[in-house]
Amino acid sequence: MSHQLLLLSSSTVYGRDFLEHAHLAIGEFLEPHRTVLFAPYAVHDQDGYTERVRRALSPFSVDVVGLYSVADPRAAIAEATLLFVGGGNTFRLAKSMQELDLLGLIGERVREGKLSYLGASAGTNLACPTLRTTNDMPIVEPRSFNALGLVPFQINPHFLDTSVNPTHMGETREMRIGEFLDENDVVVLGMREGSWLRRNGERLLLEG
């Protein structure tokens, strides 16, 4: 397999500009590419999000094309060499991608080594076998929780270690992942803020 993946836990970390914390990794990932096809379906303001990505990636001399703005999204993916799936709400993202019938094509091209995949937050969730370890509220109902399966395990982005707060009575992130593991015999990678996972073929490297 010749998967090329860069999966960010988050687009932003405290005190840094949008995508700034991962600029070096993103720059290396974008190096062979001239155009970034950007999928902003996880947010409501797709124009604004695409422009924000365009500004953030401007140092890398790439053209950013919003997938939502093209006449035929499937044809655009079939021709693209790099797809960036942005963060936001994972359920909204999955619903849109399923309705456009994009997931099968994306997975096929990534596995064939024809499409590099950059994901952030919700886009990282989408790279997993399922959506079931997202932190997001299910504001819409996708057809299925099945996702791309570009890594053989689940990821929980924005992972937070349990803090000592005696007044907090809700579940911690660790407890919620534990509930998932009660029902599923699957590895879950908790990715802290500012970290990213790089896949080059069969090699996986966690950095940040």
Task: Briefly describe each language-model feature range.
Residues V62-S116:
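Flexible gly/pro-rich beta->alpha loop and the following alpha-helix that scaffold active-site loops
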Residues A94-Q98, L103-E112, S116-P166:
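Class I SAM-dependent methyltransferase SAM-binding "motif I" and its flanking Rossmann-like core
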Residues S2-Y14, S195-G208:
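Patatin-like phospholipase A catalytic core
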Residues F153-W196, N200-G201, E207:
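Conserved anion/nucleotide-ligand pocket segment
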Residues M1-G86:
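N-terminal beta1-alpha1 cap of cysteine-dependent amidohydrolase-like domains
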